[in-house]
């Protein structure tokens, strides 16, 4: 298949409906792709005019729209019955089309069965119309023999464009600019713009829901359409810098005594260069100081070269230093015709000896895949959204983003340059549904494969992306697309990419499905490979090369963050010890949920299927580290600690600091050292630990543990890495990472129930139906017939609505459902819930205490017996022991959770606990800080799209559940017992299990306290197949024991 240096674009004076189903026609009259450099006319005149704002729109069926005669594009067309829509925006979000979410399958599947490149008959067209007057600045440029272009920065899926009734052009690939020259249309349209800049013009767009391009855009996202990015006019002077291509290389010194050097090479393409005399170029640092300048004669192709420069600070995510190149085009009369500015970061990114390096250092991507999404605006996100996302990344130690699976808005790249994020820039292409059906893969059937009719469109897509984004230092890797199998078309794309850019690596994961096309990627990239599978590659190589790895490895998607997920992430970060392991990208960044107002005025975060869209993949759109409203999910806590560049190991006599930064020492951070006595801070100091990048060092710490040991059950020694100074994304003192160790104290773990030590003025009553213990204003009542403690009061306050019941299950997580957990462990869903009490033994324990022991049979065929034992004394202390002996008989599945669930009055909604936090933790997601944390039952119920298991806290020593007046119950681990797991939620496990949306959960009428001996992990390898890892499961043949002390206050 032949490559073309530049893509051939159809030129036409009238529109053709045939283009919609012709993959060889992907644009008509579109200008060649070019860099997104900034420019002004002269020195200050802004060249652009925004056409954003309110447009008119009407939806038609495609069969009723004739784009060739296009009567709707006439200036005098009657559009009084059109509706209003904001641009940028989506037709679906504005209510004009139905929201549709599918993952792999195409949205028309089952309704129609078109064969590519054909499209469904049920195809909508949005006729957009907008009237505008040309800004005076742009009219002046036209008057001076300049040009004006019209750019659609994002439009889905295909657009036909008319200006004043004149056909302007056609465009696909909605995620890169469709730019059209409208100079003549403006001059010849409704009024002469040069003479009458206030003349009104009429812009008409026919935006199609489906075209042949739809086959290339089968990404896992909401299928949203319309003009969803900025629409603008831009004027260009007669002599104009059309494109800029920069190489800003940085070379680190390789021998002692030599200097680091940087060199700038820039290629500028000028239109009408004969009308200019000179090019003046200036490079300035962030303080405005000139570091290089030149003046040279003007011709068509301008080559700038700075030569070797010293004292240039390199760009990296750790230290994103930017310089500004200013280029002035000077006319023969000495006047400045145009001024171009471009931010520059000097850096070199290469694959050296099989390892990706930046500025000579091995890089590890601590990344996430990011869809552009907002719950209210869809993919029409704002600058504020983008800045919020960048700040989240920096605060959570995320250093890289893959623009999955399309080029992002241009401003995103500016932010990543400025704040420091590495990017894999991905071509707008996914054809997953063409080669996967009913979970059966047929990669040879994939589009585009080796079909020559698709080559032009696919090569054009990567060409448009690369030309636009080339100059951004944050872009380290080009990606050919996502989940589109492989074939000769990808070889053409790969060759074209390296023709434009021989330096950056090219990435593509799809070749793993067709190993004969391994040559289309410079990186071994896989999705959802388990850690052990990755390790095999790092040791042995790929199936095609079993003599060791030949390419650096990344997981372009891993840690499927759907719902309550991201367990066992540490198994992946542990692979960083292999030089050719270079990190991964968590799928994905933000939940794709649409905030929808319900008839009763409330709102719901809706997922697939909620709009009557079928087929649908329902809640599979909820895979984010952020919830759809951009609040961090509890999973982010784990990611932040595991992605930290500074690792801290604490012991009783030192702190060991490992600095995994590549370029930045730890000298500018402050390290706060604390001692916590049973979670309470009792000692603190601040130290400076200066460790060079890539190095480790141990620092002696004289912890005054002996001063606090006698009055504590345990001490926590903590070192916190914090920002020493405020920066653009966080204040001074913001914590980036921490390390802790636990030292035993001298106090006993808990006050055991002691009949001899209990007050003698209390009473113990052994009745025929109940046994009661009363003292110090507290009373506990144990039923002989109802299987447990049926009352626990302090004064007039009752804390037991129903006796605490055995639980052996948990609400299913998304990962549980995907791995078949419900089917495999269905027995445990009812084993505890429907357990029956088969024995009760109540007796005095001394004079001032009572012991009540209940034996339950679990509702499983083995009828395994579980013991629930209470010991209560007249001091108001209740000891609770719940024992599962382990069941050797039969092949029982592992247990989801084991302990008790206890319904409390609704007012007891506040939780304060000493354990791992502050966010929820699980057996395989517990890289959290040990401390005392405060929250509420409502706040602890994470708003996962599909209600599920949530709110668990591991390693809990004690917890206090209180009302707003401070009254409540304290739960503490028993004497000699291990820490327990617990949660306090406004909903029972059954309620969470049954609801399909958060708003379907009932108004809280009780609080549900769950005390657990243990709970299985949540998993995270994927959400459709992989179970929780064995070491984080609870084998049914092993005993489990919960031992806690209760006291009301």
Curated annotation (Swiss-Prot):
InterPro entries found in the cross-reference section: B-gal_small/dom_5, Bact_Beta-galactosidase, Beta-gal/glucu_dom_sf, Gal_mutarotase_sf_dom, Galactose-bd-like_sf, GH-type_carb-bd, Glyco_hydro_2, Glyco_hydro_2_cat
Keywords: Glycosidase, Hydrolase, Magnesium, Metal-binding
Top-level taxon in the UniProt lineage: Bacteria
Top-rank EC class of the record's enzyme: hydrolase
GO biological process terms, semicolon-separated: lactose catabolic process
Temperature dependence comment: Optimum temperature is 37 degrees Celsius with ONPG as substrate. Retains 60% of its activity between 20 and 45 degrees Celsius.
Active site residues of this protein: 483, 557
GO function terms (MF aspect): beta-galactosidase activity; carbohydrate binding; metal ion binding
Official protein name in the record: Beta-galactosidase BgaC
Organism of provenance: Bifidobacterium adolescentis (strain ATCC 15703 / DSM 20083 / NCTC 11814 / E194a)
Lineage: Bacteria, Bacillati, Actinomycetota, Actinomycetes, Bifidobacteriales
């Amino acid at each position: 298949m032949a490559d073309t240096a530049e893509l051939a674009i159809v030129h036409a004076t009238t529109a053709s409906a045939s283009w919609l189903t012709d993959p060889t026609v992907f644009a008509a009259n579109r200008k060649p792709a070019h860099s997104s450099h900034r420019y002004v006319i002269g020195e200050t005149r802004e060249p652009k005019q925004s056409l954003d704002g309110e447009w008119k729109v009407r939806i038609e069926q495609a069969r009723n729209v004739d784009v060739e005669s296009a009567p709707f594009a006439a200036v005098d067309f009657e559009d009084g019955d059109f509706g209003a829509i904001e641009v940028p925006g989506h037709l679906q979000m504005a209510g004009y089309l139905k929201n549709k979410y599918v993952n792999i399958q195409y949205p028309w599947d089952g309704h129609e069965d078109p064969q590519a490149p054909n499209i469904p008959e049920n195809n909508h067209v949005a006729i957009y119309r907008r009237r505008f007057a040309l800004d005076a600045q742009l009219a002046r440029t036209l008057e001076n023999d300049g040009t004006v272009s019209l750019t659609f920065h994002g439009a889905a899926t295909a657009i036909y464009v008319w200006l004043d009734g004149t056909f302007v052009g056609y465009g696909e690939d909605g995620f890169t600019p469709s730019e059209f020259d409208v100079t003549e249309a403006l001059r010849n349209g409704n009024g002469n713009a040069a003479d009458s800049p206030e003349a009104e013009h009429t812009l008409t767009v026919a935006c199609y829901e489906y075209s042949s391009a739809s086959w290339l855009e089968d990404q896992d996202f909401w299928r949203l359409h319309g003009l969803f990015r900025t629409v603008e006019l831009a004027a260009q002077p007669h002599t104009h810098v059309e494109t800029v291509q920069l190489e800003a290389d940085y070379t680190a010194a390789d021998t002692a005594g030599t200097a680091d050097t940087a060199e700038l090479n820039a290629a500028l393409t000028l239109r009408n260069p004969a009308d200019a005399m000179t090019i003046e170029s200036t490079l300035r640092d962030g303080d405005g100081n000139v570091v290089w300048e030149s003046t040279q004669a003007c011709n068509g192709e301008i080559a700038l070269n700075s030569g070797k420069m010293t004292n240039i600070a390199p760009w990296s995510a750790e230290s994103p230093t930017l310089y500004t190149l200013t280029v002035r085009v000077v006319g023969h009369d000495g006047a400045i015709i145009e001024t171009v500015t471009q931010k520059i970061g000097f850096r070199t990114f290469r694959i050296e000896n099989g390892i990706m390096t930046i500025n000579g250092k091995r890089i590890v991507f601590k990344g996430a895949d990011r869809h552009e999404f907002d719950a209210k605006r869809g993919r029409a996100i704002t600058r504020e959204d983008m800045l919020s996302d960048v700040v989240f990344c920096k605060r959570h130690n995320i250093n890289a983003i893959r623009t999955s699976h399309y080029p992002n808005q241009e401003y995103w790249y500016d932010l990543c340059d400025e704040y420091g994020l590495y990017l894999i820039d991905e071509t707008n292409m996914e054809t997953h549904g063409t080669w996967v059906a009913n979970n059966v893969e047929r990669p040879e059937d994939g589009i585009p494969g080796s079909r020559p009719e698709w080559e032009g469109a696919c090569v054009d897509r990567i060409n448009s992306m690369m030309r636009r984004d080339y100059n951004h230092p944050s872009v380290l890797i080009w990606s050919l697309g996502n989940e589109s199998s492989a074939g000769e078309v990808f070889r053409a794309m790969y060759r074209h990419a390296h023709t434009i850019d021989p330096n950056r690596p090219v990435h593509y994961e799809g070749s793993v499905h067709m190993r004969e096309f391994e040559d289309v990627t410079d990186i071994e990239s896989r999705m959802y490979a388990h850690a052990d599978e990755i390790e095999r590659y790092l040791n042995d190589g790929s199936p095609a090369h079993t003599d060791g790895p030949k390419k650096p490895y990344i997981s372009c998607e891993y840690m499927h963050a759907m719902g309550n997920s991201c367990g066992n992430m540490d198994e992946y970060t542990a692979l960083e010890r292999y030089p050719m392991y270079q990190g991964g990208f968590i799928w994905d960044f933000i939940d794709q949920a649409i905030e929808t107002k319900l008839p009763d005025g409330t709102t719901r975060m809706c997922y697939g299927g909620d709009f009557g869209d079928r087929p649908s993949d329902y809640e599979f759109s909820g895979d984010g580290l952020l919830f759809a409203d951009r609040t961090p999910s509890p999973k982010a806590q784990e990611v932040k600690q595991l992605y930290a560049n500074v690792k801290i190991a604490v012991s009783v006599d030192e702190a060991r600091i490992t600095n995994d930064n590549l370029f930045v020492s730890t000298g500018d951070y402050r390290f706060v050292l604390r001692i916590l006595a049973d979670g309470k801070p009792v000692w603190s100091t601040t130290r400076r630990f200066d460790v060079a990048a890539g190095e480790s060092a141990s620092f002696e710490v004289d912890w005054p543990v002996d001063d606090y040991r006698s009055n504590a059950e345990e001490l926590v020694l903590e070192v916190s890495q914090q920002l020493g100074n405020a920066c653009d994304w966080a204040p001074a003192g913001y914590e980036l990472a921490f390390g802790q160790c636990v030292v035993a104290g001298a106090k006993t773990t808990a006050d055991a129930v002691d009949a001899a030590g209990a007050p003698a003025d209390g009473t113990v009553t052994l009745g025929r139906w109940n046994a009661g213990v009363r003292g110090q204003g507290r009373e506990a009542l144990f039923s002989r017939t109802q299987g447990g403690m049926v009352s626990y009061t302090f004064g007039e306050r009752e804390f037991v609505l129903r006796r605490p019941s055995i639980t052996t299950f948990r609400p299913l997580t998304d990962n549980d459902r995907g791995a078949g957990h419900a089917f495999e462990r269905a027995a445990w869903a009812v084993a505890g819930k429907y357990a029956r009490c088969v024995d009760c033994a109540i007796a005095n324990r001394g004079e001032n205490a009572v012991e009540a022991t209940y034996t339950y049979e679990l509702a499983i065929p083995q009828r395994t017996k579980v013991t629930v034992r209470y010991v209560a004394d007249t001091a108001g202390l209740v000891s609770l022991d719940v024992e599962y002996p382990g069941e050797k008989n039969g092949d029982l599945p592992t247990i989801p959770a084991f302990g008790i669930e206890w319904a409390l009055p609704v007012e007891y909604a506040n939780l304060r606990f000493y354990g791992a936090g502050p966010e929820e933790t699980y057996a395989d997601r517990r890289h959290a800080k040990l401390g005392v944390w405060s929250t509420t039952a409502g706040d602890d119920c994470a708003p996962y799209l599909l209600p599920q298991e949530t709110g668990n806290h591991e390693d809990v020593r004690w917890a206090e559940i209180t009302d707003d007046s401070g009254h409540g119950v304290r739960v503490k681990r028993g004497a000699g017992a291990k820490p327990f797991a617990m949660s306090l939620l406004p909903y029972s496990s059954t309620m969470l299990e049954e609801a399909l949306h958060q708003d379907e959960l009932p108004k809280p009428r009780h609080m549900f306290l769950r005390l657990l001996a243990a709970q299985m992990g949540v998993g995270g390898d994927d959400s459709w197949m992989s179970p929780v890892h064995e070491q984080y499961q609870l084998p049914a043949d092993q005993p489990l024991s919960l031992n806690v002390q209760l006291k009301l206050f």
